[in-house]
Amino acid sequence: MEEDAFPKAYDPKGLEEKLYAFWEESTMFTAQAASDKPPYAIIMPPPNVTGILHMGHALVNTLQDVLIRYKRMSGFEVCWVPGTDHAGIATQTVVERHLYSSLGKRRVDFSREEFLEHVWQWKEKSEGVILSQLRQLGCSCDWSRLRFTMEPLANRAVKKAFKILFDKGHIYRGNYLVNWDPVLQTALADDEVEYEEKDGWLYYIRYRVVGSSEHIVVATTRPETLLGDTAIAISPDDERYSHLLGAKVHLPFVDREIPIIADMSVDPLFGTGAVKITPAHDKDDYRTGMHHNLPMINILTPTGEINENGGIFAGLSKEKARESIITALETLGLFVKKEPYKLRVGVSYRSGAVIEPYLSKQWFVSVDSFRDSLREFVASDAIKIFPPEFTKNYLTWVNNLRDWCISRQLWWGHRIPVWYHKSDAHRMLCYDGEGIPEEVAKDPESWEQDPDVLDTWFSSGLWPLTCLGWPDSECGDLEKFYPTAVLVTGHDILFFWVTRMVLLCSAMVGKKPFSDVFLHGLIFGKSYKRYNDLGEWTYITGEEKYAYDMGKALPKGVIAKWEKLSKSKGNVIDPLEMIAKYGADAVRMALCSCANRGEQIDLDYRLFEEYKNFANKIWNGARFIFSHISNLTSQDLARGIDTTLLGLEDYYILDGFNRLLKELHSAYQNYAFDKITTMAYEFFRNNFCSTYIEIIKPTLYGKQRSKEDQLTKQKLLAVLLVNILGVLHPIAPFVTETLFLKLKEVIGEIKEECSDAITAHALAMLRADSYVVAPYPQSIDIVIPEHLHESFALAERLVYTVRNIRGEMQLDSRASLEVFVICPEGVSIETYVPMVCALGGISSIENLTEEPKDRIYSLGVVEGIRLGVFVPVEHIAKEKTRLEKEKTRLENAIESASRLLSSESFRAKANPDLVCAKEEALKNNRIELQSILDKLASFS
């Protein structure tokens, strides 16, 4: 293949789509449960059907695909199950907004069935977009096993799991204080609440003691909940209030009397040492109320307004009620003061609304029975967490785990499979079959199903099982691929999802859901902001931001900061835009290269640009090789390689490749994706292209050595290319597959068997229809010459010396140099000559016994070997001028330093270390000056 017939630049447009269609149509991604290969399964963290893929999705699915492609090539029966999540709260919210903006209707304007029909339509449209985007990224999923968390199989699994836990008493229902989102009007689990620190107030309120002229002052951050107070609590050790124990205080506005009680939970140093107890609206108060059997009075509606229990304040929002109550307390002389106070406020992770502790009848999973097994799976390394520092986080969380609220007041989701008898609320039926229970069917008017749905994380917690066919009895996938190999996900959902999968899956089948968990960091983008004309910070977006990302200097007044990706901050990077601009391989490699083991991944446009250039480097490296192996055949490779014809550079690259494979295997075992990428990058770019190919170019062009040597190099290039591209394939599948298919065209059909140590495995790889199903590169079994690395290091130092002299003399990097060497007795550099000539840009190396007298040269010394670079005749005058300038500079420096060091005053006052440094610099300058003088003398 002529080099000119091969496009000079890699253009992924068009190629990627065609390649993916080829892979998918050939069913290369489809797993066989009946295979006798060892299993390797991953279940995809299902993206929500709420929109399009973001950069986090691109990251997590790239990392999984890298593992999947590596393991598939390594001989495993690979099963990567894709899927999407119904995402209860998120999807219902998005669809509600869509219906309101398009039809002007709210959810309550539809029947439940009508609304759900709209959600299903949204799901079908959105899911198709998401799956298309996963294909663009190159994800080699088994599409025949596509799952959805609301499909019939998932619904059967959810109902079965619920009933198993219900029958064992692990699921219960009761009036409990939950995290209530007044915007979405649903309960949230503890870990769905995010906490923010905000500036607030501590209010001091006076309560009058009944039948006495005394009063007690209480400090609170929420005066509006006074309407639901059922006690005042003090510490039993607080002597200030001990005489009031058992007394009652009058509660204004609602005309109730509430007791003063003693409780160990009260901190006597907080506020006045007396606190109001509102069990229905504070978690600590709830526990106190349960302990003392206090009434629990809910004062809020589901939308966060004061209800009928608030008397004259009924119908007001919380905020308005607070203002009105403070005003009314002031009028009654019951308001004392307010002080600034830092508040820790819970907000909904989904709507951003301030969470309200709210007394509500909900379903819970009791976690006490599972705590030991959750802890043991990880503590015993049955499940290994990477990075290991997250193991401590996991165990701490498990030790402090509270019962999980699993009911949600939504329409979109898995309906709770429980029916209530209308005339007897305590009469319940839990049913996991199809349709409705027989008893309900006989008397449907007397029964109603629980209107709530299950928390999305309940169905997601069963994901490893449902992806593999559970609970269906004939389930070969489950037998073959469960437990799965690894879960790859963000560290931010370790508790949301990972722990719940361990809990639910082990409770259902008695086995862990996966062996490893890799937790990647969260992606941060660089944001830039400046003050606008109004004196407000504004974020910079568009072309200006892109220019700064690419290295443009920041002007005065512009501040840069790494922050979580946010549209409002202008630092969101769209993976689909990046694929369109740079190609999928560049995006994949950029993401892998920064997938470190920390909590933060810094990502900007420069990385995509760098790896686009690297994809082009791969292309051009292969392009050069194809131009030199166009006449090579499979028969040539089958005949093997004569190792007696291998040079130092050949052993160097083969040994380097073997070392690379070993290091890559370790990196894959430890999920070190950044190392996988950078090691493959550096080996291809530096070891293979910049060093090895440069060394053998003269042989390839027929300028050095014999035709037999040339053929050996061509064979070795083909072997190395198929192997190195194979190493790169998991991280850059499109460019490597394109080149692999072209290499197969060049080599032709392989009919011959081969047992050669160097070429056999390369031929086995080339027999495959695609890298997707090709065997992974193997270590090449050759005997490495003794002292290979020491010898190669010496050759590199000789090259470095030549390059250094070239730089000193300011010779053109393309100029061919003439060099002489004088070796110590018993030392020869004959083995290194081809390498040193190729890398040093040397036309000839002459072996001498003494320095020449008739030519001008610049000399360097490497391990006793004197190496001289002859100064080209046309460069002598320029070099002499340069040396004269350097001589003058050194003489001035020596004179100045000598004068300073001869000063007794300087020596007396200066730090001894400074004096020593000045003396050392003077000594080095004198040595350098003598070298310059010697060189100038040689010009005469």
UniProtKB/Swiss-Prot annotation:
It is found in: Cytoplasm. It catalyses: tRNA(Val) + L-valine + ATP = L-valyl-tRNA(Val) + AMP + diphosphate. InterPro entries: aa-tRNA-synth_I_CS, aa-tRNA-synth_Ia, Anticodon_Ia_Val, M/V/L/I-tRNA-synth_anticd-bd, Rossmann-like_a/b/a_fold, tRNA-bd_arm, tRNAsynth_Ia_anticodon-bd, Val-tRNA_synth_C_sf. ATP binds at residue 567. GO terms for biological process: valyl-tRNA aminoacylation. Residues 873-937 form a coiled coil. Belongs to the class-I aminoacyl-tRNA synthetase family. ValS type 1 subfamily. This is Valine--tRNA ligase. It comes from Chlamydia abortus (strain DSM 27085 / S26/3) (Chlamydophila abortus). The gene is valS.
